[in-house]
Amino acid sequence: MAGAQPGVHALQLKPVCVSDSLKKGTKFVKWDDDSTIVTPIILRTDPQGFFFYWTDQNKETELLDLSLVKDARCGKHAKAPKDPKLRELLDVGNIGHLEQRMITVVYGPDLVNISHLNLVAFQEEVAKEWTNEVFSLATNLLAQNMSRDAFLEKAYTKLKLQVTPEGRIPLKNIYRLFSADRKRVETALEACSLPSSRNDSIPQEDFTPDVYRVFLNNLCPRPEIDNIFSEFGAKSKPYLTVDQMMDFINLKQRDPRLNEILYPPLKQEQVQVLIEKYEPNSSLAKKGQMSVDGFMRYLSGEENGVVSPEKLDLNEDMSQPLSHYFINSSHNTYLTAGQLAGNSSVEMYRQVLLSGCRCVELDCWKGRTAEEEPVITHGFTMTTEISFKEVIEAIAECAFKTSPFPILLSFENHVDSPKQQAKMAEYCRLIFGDALLMEPLEKYPLESGVPLPSPMDLMYKILVKNKKKSHKSSEGSGKKKLSEQASNTYSDSSSVFEPSSPGAGEADTESDDDDDDDDCKKSSMDEGTAGSEAMATEEMSNLVNYIQPVKFESFEISKKRNKSFEMSSFVETKGLEQLTKSPVEFVEYNKMQLSRIYPKGTRVDSSNYMPQLFWNAGCQMVALNFQTVDLAMQINMGMYEYNGKSGYRLKPEFMRRPDKHFDPFTEGIVDGIVANTLSVKIISGQFLSDKKVGTYVEVDMFGLPVDTRRKAFKTKTSQGNAVNPVWEEEPIVFKKVVLPSLACLRIAAYEEGGKFIGHRILPVQAIRPGYHYICLRNERNQPLTLPAVFVYIEVKDYVPDTYADVIEALSNPIRYVNLMEQRAKQLAALTLEDEEEVKKEADPGETSSEAPSETRTTPAENGVNHTASLAPKPPSQAPHSQPAPGSVKAPAKTEDLIQSVLTEVEAQTIEELKQQKSFVKLQKKHYKEMKDLVKRHHKKTTELIKEHTTKYNEIQNDYLRRRAALEKSAKKDSKKKSEPSSPDHGSSAIEQDLAALDAEMTQKLIDLKDKQQQQLLNLRQEQYYSEKYQKREHIKLLIQKLTDVAEECQNNQLKKLKEICEKEKKELKKKMDKKRQEKITEAKSKDKSQMEEEKTEMIRSYIQEVVQYIKRLEEAQSKRQEKLVEKHNEIRQQILDEKPKLQTELEQEYQDKFKRLPLEILEFVQEAMKGKISEDSNHGSAPPSLASDAAKVNLKSPSSEEIERENPGREFDTPL
């Protein structure tokens, strides 16, 4: 996948797979330098690959977390015992070469503080197998980015491995692991029917994975997940159906930025597979139902990581020039602490390279021993020296263990001995071998204009950056320079231990140290010692090809030279100065050439500047002090964690394309870059601290200056709860992230006193939206097992506020309409509009006469004119007698009781549907689009006319200048003519020249007119094509919108009809009951016996009558509904019928326009030319001869028939 191309990425990362031999265990001998005792052990790895563990003869178990392992070495690279007795003990039996059976496992919390586990195998093959397997497990990218469920399983595995000799789990280990709240642990154990005394232990079989899960649910209850579960459909039922689960995944968890064709939403069968995987109740799973327990498991499962595994994999295009990548770079790689004192270490080169760094620095100085071996140290400081040769060996050993892409060696060469420089070159050639790139590649010669080769072209290659010997200088001057530097640099051997300045750090190899002013002194302090670099010898020069350091002069000079193999280094202060003064030029420079930024010399504590500053300018090698894990280094680790941890990250497109210019200080949206909107809601935390303290979470954003927001959000501090604090606060919204591909989100947790707990740095482009666990990491970017933050993230393409209403209306038209109506009512209540409306209705005549007309005449080119029948009528034009859309009219009372309760329901007409706000909103949007289109073309036309006016003036001025010269010559000739000796043939020649000049001028005007006419014609045709295409699309959208509005309104009307039917039945019963009461009242006037008989008869007949009337009413209601549905269908068909009609009208309109266009353009050009020539004649700037020739310019205009003949079959409906 080195040359990954855009599209669906095929995941190349392999999940953790532990071989059987590692699971079963193997016998080894463990030894330590500090002791002469060797210990036979059985070494194993758990099936999930979480831990390395071993048991000795006393059956005591020790663990080593594989996430702490940095490297595994065997053979000559493994650590060898120094003590001869120890070596003898280890080589018992002489089974095979001891060196080939030795293994060293390197582990530690960071790059500096490392430890070694030294082992000896009994067979060479076993040593190789274990070395390869352990290194593979330790560097597995999926293992470093496990799901929440996997981290909880890791904690469980640790408890299961740390057992007593009897195979029982001590409860003290559980209390130690979950130490934040002892009382909670005790209660959770009791809930699982387990003993709770700290001194007790439990059998392994009693603490199964299911029991462990129940224990966690009691220890850390999750009410917030219950709320999400019920909110998404499980209110009345204790489960989610497969459809509800599908909606949850597709609506909440899916990234809306993804292409739906390449990354389609999940289907039912795919969701069913997930349910079967995570739902513990098999009977529910078979029915496609998911309980809250299964839902919790899904949220913490591997499918629901906050970053897609594809982003961790090598997924970027690695075939572009080297200058198109950010390259993970180290400064003063050999240092383990500060810049002035402390140890230098060969091991730092191994650790830095293993961590993914691809550019390391070597500060080389002349060795002062008898062997004359060059050394690496920080000059003029009290840091220790290390062997240059050992460093080269270390680089060769670890160069390509974690990444196959090229290594760049940045030499700061102070070795003023030609002999020692020759040694350095020889070591590089011999130790690196074929990996050292000695000659440029055939496809990429060192020539101006040729780009750098790609990381893919340079795979498994080592490139040297060192001063290149100048062939212009003589050999003698070179020797003189070397001798001068020798006397200056090492005049006294003790000078190495005397710091020359507080800023004794690196300097750029191109710094100018000849100036003496204050600015240069400050610059020198920042830049450090590299100004005194030695002259490169022939041997070292021969190693340099694609990375030739040169003194930076200016961006203009670099652009003129156009040599991609030349690069410059900038101390951070100089780099910041260039970034501030010339940001766009800096970005342009970095498209073609490499630049290296390094910390200023005054950072004696090895602190770091923020690398984001220079990534924003496209700087490739932003070198940091890897030994200092501050925020800047954490951001750097977060950056290079992705793309297969290859050490290379492809720069954003605008920082690579030569046809685009990018300003890192931009505050607006960049054309061609889709900005994002990001919303983060911190919901809760789990096991954040091992102490009973309050906790809080902070959110930061880093990116372009406009995107960066430090401490953008902070939750409230939880009160003494670090186990399961719930915040449920309002989300923090990053409304506009201008450059998402270079922005990252940082979520960090702290204890109430401000003590750092853990954090996670996530690239905005890689973040998955939805409900996710953020598994925290420590400041060294190593994963923490238990601490996590549960969040809800929304990420989408940014929509400016101008279009927010349109997007809202499109995404949820009903809610939008309701919201608009609600706002209108609220405003009316505040502005007393209701009373005004009442007054207007009381005197309609006055209103109609006084109210100003607000009706706008739609412009001819506005995109709505072509749909005149779709245009809504303004409210002021609507007659007052017209009922509201979907209103119900009550007819006059009749004797028929059914008709008296039956109300008439009218279907909404097309005109009424067009009054709907969502439809009107779309029309306004289309109007704006057409207005913008016409405006753009008008601007082009204006520019073209200006261009032709300028050309006309040029022709005219040239003509006048030449005519004046001829007339002047004619005057001289006339003077000569008056002399007797002058011949008479001169005047006739001048008249011929003037006539020729006039003819030439006329022809130029004709050519100019023809050209102008053709260009204007092309431009206007292009405009008409655009208009026609836009209008055609608008018709489609408007018809679709009107259809949708009709369906929505009609569905609402049918729902409302059901309510009306129920009301009518109640009204009918009410009226019939009233009649019955009247009859009963009449019967009361009769005698008692007759009254009882009539009352009984009335009740019987009343029941029959009610049944009959209800039946008749239902029949009438049914017929009414059928008529309404029929009318609805008719209206929808009318809407659909409008589409071809409008399209036909549009076609005809533009056929007519295209036919008229050539004549219109011709007339326009002729009038313009006439006017111009006439104006010039009035001002005396055009001679009569030229003005008289104006008629020659007016050519005959072609007829429409001629145009058709010249353009047979010409179609004017082709979209742009």
From Swiss-Prot:
Protein name in UniProt: 1-phosphatidylinositol 4,5-bisphosphate phosphodiesterase beta-1
Keyword field contains Membrane: yes
SMART domains given in the database record: C2, PLCXc, PLCYc
GO cellular component, one term: plasma membrane
Domain PI-PLC Y-box: 540-656
Keyword Calcium attached: yes
Lineage: Eukaryota, Metazoa, Chordata, Craniata, Vertebrata
Domain of life (superkingdom): Eukaryota
Enzyme Commission number(s) of this protein: 3.1.4.11
Cited function: Catalyzes the hydrolysis of 1-phosphatidylinositol 4,5-bisphosphate into diacylglycerol (DAG) and inositol 1,4,5-trisphosphate (IP3) and mediates intracellular signaling downstream of G protein-coupled receptors. Regulates the function of the endothelial barrier.
Other observations noted: The receptor-mediated activation of PLC-beta-1 is mediated by two G-protein alpha subunits, alpha-Q and alpha-11.
Organism field: Mus musculus
Compartment annotation: Nucleus membrane; Cytoplasm
Gene Ontology BP annotations: activation of meiosis involved in egg activation; brain development; cell adhesion; cellular response to fluoride; cellular response to glyceraldehyde; cellular response to ionomycin; cellular response to vasopressin; cerebral cortex development
